[in-house]
Amino acid sequence: MARAKNAGTGPDGRAEMGLPPPGPASLKRLLPLYAVVFAGFVGYSLMITVFTPMIMSNHDLLLRADEPMSRRVILLGILLCLYPLGQFAGSPVLGALSDRFGRKPVLMISLCFTTGCYALIAIALSLRSFALLASASLLAGLAEANVVAAQSAIADVITPEERNRFFGYIYLSASSAYIVGPLVGGKLADPDLVSWFGNATPFWAAMLVLAMTTAATGLVFRETNPPGRRHSVSFSQAFTNLQGVISNRRLRRLYWLNFAFYLAIFGFFRCYPMYLVDRFHLGVSQISEFVAWVGVPIVIANAWFTGFLAVRFTTRTLTLWSAFLTGAFMIVVVAIHTRASLWVTLFLTSAALAICLPACATLLSKATSEAEQGRVMGNNQALQVGAEALSGLVGGLAAALFVELPLILLGLLAMTAALLLKFGISRHNDDRPGASLESQ
């Protein structure tokens, strides 16, 4: 990640920046934001867990009973791409609004709107309306500001040298939600446990969790961007900055390699549940257990393993091998046709991609000057969310041919991109200006 070393950011520089002393107080001040991230991702994790078996097996008659499977997986891919598509469009605007009006007002409005969207999702499932479900998913993504607010607030009160650790807590909160959300949500959607449980029940529960989180945030969270530090912003600038992905010749290849890695990784998250439902005929309760299991190595990586590897290997090496292994393990998932093997193959795939995700961003950050960090990493985040949205559509279209195809294609994409990093980008390219990628 960014390793800014500006003057005045040491122990004495904190006072010059108007920042509080480092220590437990900083974490306590930001704790409500981590709770918001956790609650938001609990809700988001339910979409993959519930929507996949629901659409493919038509448990709730959301689609016509005679709808062919090829059309079902395409519609599922479209449905799963809508939330990140909303994020792609909404996050830059919400981030700009929080710069202008403060973090807390934007976060509170976002939370209220998102809470309402989850109620709308539950209503759509109860009414068996695919159109309303799709609209609510898109609106929820547009309103989602938890990660952008958390990152901005951390930048407000934490020095650059300390930010990696505090940003890491964001990913730890999100990955923990991917364990809790599917496990609890899968059971709440199982009518065999309680007769009145159904696909809408987890989203009503998510709405209640978000409502309580909203109330707690309003009471506890203190503004980190006071009026004296706010500034007017250009909303169009957030989008025109993306031109750098094409125009920046020095970073262009790294941008597009990262996009390929992100497309493969987020495509995996959307496509392996399709494979489980089609191949092993799993219901929502069983799917939820595998989705939660995939989250376990991500938590381990964020909590410890990535840091352990980072001090022993170069960023380039970590990116290359983790991406290659991610692709190889994806193909192994569909190559071994036993349900018991999934506990191993899914774990290995998730472990590899959990290392690859932060390594991609770090590799790009180290190739960037300090003055460009914000713009370049913003572009990278936009590429990540864009790839996440596209992956659902690509996965659905490929699965319409046969359900194993998306994981095979995405696996080959990750492996090819890793080889391009190895042989297509010179070892003497900048890691930071004037430094080799291999020198870190």
Where are these regions (language model features)?
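A late C-terminal transmembrane helix in Major Facilitator Superfamily
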Residues: 372-401
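Short amphipathic helix-loop junctions that connect adjacent transmembrane helices
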Residues: 50-73, 270-286
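Hydrophobic core of transmembrane alpha-helices in multi-pass small-molecule transporters
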Residues: 38, 117, 130-145, 341-355
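C-terminal ends and interior cores of transmembrane alpha-helices
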Residues: 112-127, 324-337
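Juxtamembrane intracellular "pre-TM" segments in multi-pass secondary transporters
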Residues: 13-27, 222-256, 440
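C-terminal transmembrane helical hairpin of 12-TM major facilitator-type secondary transporters
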Residues: 316-360
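Cytoplasmic helix-loop-helix junction between adjacent transmembrane helices
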Residues: 136-174
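Helix-to-loop junctions at the C-terminal end of transmembrane segments
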Residues: 89-102, 301-315, 399
